[in-house]
Curated annotation (Swiss-Prot):
HAMAP family given in the database record: CinA_B (MF_00226_B)
Protein name: CinA-like protein
Recorded family membership: Belongs to the CinA family.
Organism the protein comes from: Kosmotoga olearia (strain ATCC BAA-1733 / DSM 21960 / TBF 19.5.1)
Matches recorded under NCBIfam families: cinA_nterm, molyb_syn, PncC_domain, PRK00549.1
Length: 412
């Protein structure tokens, strides 16, 4: 099946809005094995939308539109679709009621334009919008399929996932199953380079890398007659990827780094405490977000000043004087100090310069040291992180959790 995407909206032509819908739909169609032939952007103009429909259906059986479903006079996608297929626009009473319910208890007022949104091309399959007032619809006519979706991504994406995806899967007569591998400590470019050969040889399953907040997600998607067959197709691809990336893969699906660390602590029967400076308690906060953590996490201290490092963690004044607060030596003493003070098997420390001030040529902004104490043995990790203050702090916290994860893996 060949498909085309028509993005409707003058604001897209003018560059006022980034067309993320087309990117999203392209990836989803690829996952389904539907060949995307062309993407078109057209303004809010009846004749141009009709021309886009005519040209697209000469090339493809499936056309998906986004946008042009709003309450204003220049929102014309449904009107154009009705005219193209010689259909009437008819009132869809369940949609009308849903729109009225949407405005109950809101400061916004129901307008004539909103009522217009309840009219649907006659005979179309209505797609409910649970996040706005503009329903989508599917028109099937003489071997042609037109899927009309709202423009706002927060409305379009859930509609596609819950209604359009199952519809297209049924057309394709297949089950679509995905597995996500979570990677930390390696950038997207390097991840792609490492598994380049696997990606180049992909067909079914497909592999899609995504960078997300300091980590990389690898989505492996298979099409098959049933879930069991799809899982069997994914397994050898996952094995190849794991052989290439090793311990950089920390989890699967929705697992977070902190959940993995807490689970490893439970399996090993070890306890942990944290001593943080530049991250200001972020690591401890992430750990305690995991339910049932009280059996493995004992204590977290924010020792921001040198005085606190000496008084609360037992860092030597001589160490601070000779090497400074941001140093390997201080990080190790912080980790050892918190472990001994809290009586835990593991002590984790972070000290660094989050910026935007405080950096020097010798110790620039973004310099971070992680200290780790595990039953008498110590280790340290040096990081040089980029970005603003919040990004540095968040990335440092994630690297700290990963530092603990890697130390625990051989003990399980």
């Amino acid at each position: 099946m060949k498909a085309e995407i028509i993005s409707v909206g003058t604001e897209l032509l003018l560059g006022d809005i980034l067309n993320t819908n087309a990117q999203y739909l392209s990836k989803k169609l690829a996952e389904l094995g539907i060949f995307l032939y062309r993407q078109t952007v057209v303004g809010d103009n009846m004749d141009r939308i009709l021309q886009a429909f005519d040209e697209a259906f000469k090339r493809s059986e499936l056309v998906i539109t986004t946008g042009g479903l709003g309450p204003t006079q220049d929102d014309l996608t449904k009107e154009a679709a009705a005219k193209f297929f010689s259909k009437k626009l008819v009132l869809h009473k369940p949609t009308l009621q849903a729109i009225k319910d949407y405005f109950k208890g809101r400061e916004e007022y129901l307008t004539e334009g909103n009522l217009k949104q309840a009219y649907i091309p006659e005979g179309a399959i209505v797609l409910d919008n649970f996040y706005g007032t503009a329903p989508g619809c599917i028109i099937e006519d003489s071997g042609k399929i037109l899927i009309i979706l709202p423009g706002p991504p927060k409305e379009m994406e859930p509609m596609f996932e819950t209604a359009v995806m199952p519809y297209l899967m049924k057309l394709q007569n297949c089950v679509l199953y995905s597995k996500v591998l979570r990677v930390f400590g390696m950038g997207e470019c390097l991840v792609v380079e490492k598994i380049k050969e696997i990606i180049e040889n992909q067909d079914n399953p497909t592999i899609a890398p995504y960078a997300k907040e300091g980590e990389v997600l690898l989505r492996i998607t298979a099409r098959a007659d049933n879930k069991e067959l799809a899982e069997g197709m994914i397994a050898p691809i996952e094995k190849q990827i794991r052989e290439k990336l090793g311990e950089y893969i920390y989890g699967v699906g929705e697992e977070s780094l902190e959940e993995i660390v807490v689970n490893l602590l439970r399996k090993t029967g070890l306890t942990i405490s944290t001593a943080e400076s530049c991250t200001g308690g972020l690591v401890a906060s992430k750990i305690v977000n995991v339910a049932g953590v009280s059996k493995v996490f004992m204590e977290g201290i924010i020792a921001y000043s040198n005085e606190a490092k000496v008084k609360r963690l037992g860092v030597k004044k001589e160490t601070l004087s000779k090497f400074g607060a941001v140093s390997e030596e201080t990080a190790i003493e912080m980790a050892s100090g918190i472990a001994k003070s809290a009586g835990t098997d593991i002590g984790l420390s972070i000290t660094g310069i989050a910026g935007p001030t405080g950096g020097t040529p010798e110790k620039p902004v973004g310099l971070v040291y992680l200290g780790l104490y595990v039953n008498g043995k110590t280790a340290v990790k040096k990081l040089q992180l980029g970005g603003d203050r919040n990004k540095i702090r968040n990335r440092a916290a994630m690297f700290a959790l990963d530092f603990v994860r890697r130390a625990l893996l051989p003990l399980v």
